[in-house]
Amino acid sequence: MLQQQESPIPRLGVGEEGVVGRHVFGEVWGVNDKLLQDDEYLKNLVIKAAEVANMHLVDVKVWRFGGGDKGGVSVIALVLESHIAIHTWPAYNYATIDVYTCGEHSRPWDAYDYIIKQLNPKTFTKTIVDRSSK
């Protein structure tokens, strides 16, 4: 039978015993649609968020999806520690944000908070999950 365990957040001090995984993700509503369509702005936002969170950037890719007023942008930053992703739906003033890191030295919540501050949504969610192996 599958057992659910309570998990302290953030979980520190596990480095030598196993994988330290920290996952921060959520959604934003009420963001300026022009920001959510601006792939260069979003790319630079993710780069700066990685820096703020003490992550080591490997590469950033940007994709535009759809067309017209319903087209969105996806930005994925590969960082040595894992990834940062933003997916936008400008027609709905909506986006999702995902920051996942492995290791004890990075601070994914700082990256998430930086992105939120820069996007300035009317409302947002923030979920922090400990994804450590022990």
Curated annotation (Swiss-Prot):
Is synthesized initially as an inactive proenzyme. Formation of the active enzyme involves a self-maturation process in which the active site pyruvoyl group is generated from an internal serine residue via an autocatalytic post-translational modification. Two non-identical subunits are generated from the proenzyme in this reaction, and the pyruvate is formed at the N-terminus of the alpha chain, which is derived from the carboxyl end of the proenzyme. Binds 1 pyruvoyl group covalently per subunit. GO terms for biological process: arginine catabolic process; spermidine biosynthetic process. Its EC number is 4.1.1.19. Transmembrane segments: none annotated. Pathway: Amine and polyamine biosynthesis; agmatine biosynthesis; agmatine from L-arginine: step 1/1. It catalyses: L-arginine + H(+) = agmatine + CO2. Its cofactor is pyruvate. PANTHER family: S-ADENOSYLMETHIONINE DECARBOXYLASE PROENZYME. The active site is at S82 (schiff-base intermediate with substrate), H87 (proton acceptor), C102 (proton donor). GO terms for cellular component: cytosol. It is an enzyme of class 4 (lyase). Specifically catalyzes the decarboxylation of L-arginine to agmatine. Has no S-adenosylmethionine decarboxylase (AdoMetDC) activity. This is Arginine decarboxylase proenzyme.
